[in-house]
């Protein structure tokens, strides 16, 4: 009689419980596999093959906009293996016929780029800084945020966490949150209170998502209207209005849940679309950096190595007080500016040259770790 393996692996938490982030864009962690075969060795072998496929799919979902992913044929194992730098087993359990594991994959950036470019697929690599979502629900003329019930906040809490390029964070809803900002202040875009709660959560921006159920007079046709607006960050003041219609079977709860899920996906996809790497557009600029000590240049240099848009950078001159660098980058200067901002670096255009400096309002959020493969200089 076969031994039954009873084990519980880590279950993905909700957005409110955890902010799942990989160490860098080309690392895919927490890949769960569960395979049964005639022997444990065979089950393990099959599980690792399956893990390669699952990790590749997650990487593609992370980098490639939704409208492009359908253009990628399902790859074979022989297609995927050359793209993998390494993999490791984070945890595993096995019986005589079953294998369960949690795997972590590191992909080769250069090879993945070449793979996607060969298929004409556009993709992004820039990870946004953390964004705090405040779901405000309007009901019977009242604005709800921390109130119970707030079905809109509940729906956002049920959205699975994303390990994509746009890390969204939901507030806990504790006394500090209630003290810092009210539903009315969030809906009105009170800059001071929004900045206060954003700083406490280490967020670079706040996305206020206001929802209300609308009923069309005469027909009683129902829809959920949602307005989202960014406060702070590189997308400040961007506003989007969407409407979600009800079917005959829909309830408020089902439509609200669907809207939260779709908007979270759309927010991620919008970020990717705005930060696509344009390999066919190569530009350059010279930027000056004011220095008070050499350590600043060393830190700036390490940050520049992590910017996906940079094809290379070249030190033009350096003194005890100043440095000048030539940045050769893909796309336009605005995309480069946004990418640098995610690393707390400000790019500004001066009378002659551009300038680079550390952001004065850098959050306490730690910068993403270094990628497995650095951008060539």
In which residue ranges do the predicted regions lie?
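N-terminal segment of the mature soluble domain
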Residues: 48-72, 127-129, 133-190, 300, ...
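Sec/Tat signal peptide C-region and signal peptidase I cleavage site
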Residues: 12-16
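Short, well-ordered alpha-helical segments
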Residues: 33-76, 193, 254-266, 295-306
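Amphipathic beta-strand/beta-sheet edge segments enriched in Tyr/Trp
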Residues: 27-30, 109-111, 201-252, 335-337, ...
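C-terminal soluble interaction/assembly domains
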Residues: 234-253, 258-262, 271, 275, ...
